[in-house]
Design a protein with these regions (language model features):
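ABC transporter nucleotide-binding domains
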Residues: 1-196, 202
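Short, surface-exposed acidic/glycine-rich loop or hinge patches that mediate macromolecular interfaces
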Residues: 52-55, 221, 252, 277
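Alpha-helical elements of the RecA-like P-loop NTPase motor core of helicases
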Residues: 76, 183, 229, 256, ...
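Active-site-adjacent beta-strand anchor residues
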Residues: 77, 220, 248, 272-273
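A short linear hydrophobic-aromatic micro-motif
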Residues: 110, 235-239, 268-273
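ABC transporter nucleotide-binding domain
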Residues: 160-250
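C-terminal coupling/interaction segments
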Residues: 250-320
């Protein structure tokens, strides 16, 4: 975009299955999705999606991909059945076949009884379900879902995530899901790609990436600050939230070092266990390594990035 490089030296391979696309606001996620859909042309480089060239075969790519955009792409004056049917016709489906499929997919996404209502009367959850129906009418091999659970209440969100899970586990489809809701990504996706300033910051299996920095969680009673200072003085890496501390599990001696420090400062450890990191934890650790001070993913995913100007490393952890 003019002098600004939205994507730079981005080299990655995404395999079949479910992949979460993550990154701060302005990281290049939308540009990446539009590029692989063939909607915009990359100024350099090359790529393929399902074996099709992103530069010359955009129409072929879009015929095999279902795209559920974040923005409102529905006609409020159309009945859901005709909106979904129209999506099929845009993809070249016979009108009779498109109508038959529209009934099927609207039933699948839970709108079978509401299919003749105008979309303008739908709730946010029903509109999201309609967009999902539009994206799968042609039975695509890959579904790109951009913020699929955004703005949904708990019930609608659960239904959306369960439906995407079912598509991956039982429908033999691949899903690429961009979302700021880490719990949703972790439930649906096995793999993740994290973009930062248009570059690849991390890629791999979520479980493998979470295992890079294992931690021991301790619940402390008495002299918590002294214990924190003592552990840090001998080189242990500590994250603290009140009386709960997480210590980087560097080797087999870490536990004994923690206990020795607690004894020295007369602090009681009421509980100690291996901490099971979440995708949220992983995201924060990676972004902190890139120079940002964050408390939650919301700080970066839904608001402008502020922090030191640090270039993303070429690659971090995991498999492709």
């Amino acid at each position: 975009y003019g002098p600004h490089l939205a994507l730079e030296n981005l080299n990655l391979k995404i395999r079949k299955g479910a992949t979460g696309l993550l990154g701060p606001n302005g990281a290049g996620k939308s540009t990446f999705l539009k590029t692989i859909l063939g909607l915009i042309q990359a100024t350099s480089g090359h790529g393929t999606v399902l074996g099709h060239d992103i530069r010359t075969e955009g129409a072929a790519i879009r015929s095999r991909i279902g795209y559920m955009p974040e923005y409102d792409a529905l006609n409020p004056d159309m009945e859901a059945i005709h909106q979904v049917k129209y999506s099929g016709e845009l993809l070249g489906m016979n009108p009779v076949v498109a109508m038959s499929r529209a009934h099927e997919v609207l039933q699948y996404v839970g709108l079978g009884e509401q299919r003749y209502r105008n979309i303008g009367s739908f709730s946010t959850g029903m509109k999201q379900a309609t967009k999902l129906a539009c994206s799968i009418i042609h039975d695509p091999e890959l579904i790109i879902a951009d913020e699929p659970s955004n703005g949904l209440d708990a019930t609608a969100r659960e239904f959306m995530i369960s439906t995407l899970q079912n598509m991956v586990n039982n429908g033999n489809r691949s899903v690429m899901m961009a979302s700021h809701l880490m719990d949703d990504v972790e439930r649906v996706c096995e793999n993740m790609v994290l973009l930062h300033k248009g570059k690849l910051a991390a890629q791999g299996k979520i479980d493998d990436l979470k295992d890079i920095d294992r931690e021991i969680e301790i619940h402390v009673w008495g002299n918590a600050s002294k214990l924190e200072e003592k552990m840090m003085s001998i080189g242990l890496i500590v994250r603290r939230e009140g009386r709960i501390m997480r210590v980087l599990h560097e080797n087999d001696d870490t536990t004994s070092k923690i206990l020795a420090c607690a004894k020295e400062v007369d602090s009681q450890i009421r509980r100690m266990h291996e901490y099971e990191a979440s995708l949220e934890d992983l995201f924060i650790v990676i972004m902190e390594n890139l120079g940002y001070e964050v408390k939650t993913s919301e700080d970066l995913l839904r608001s402008p990035v502020q922090g030191r100007q640090v270039d993303a490393p070429g690659y971090m952890g995991g498999g492709s």
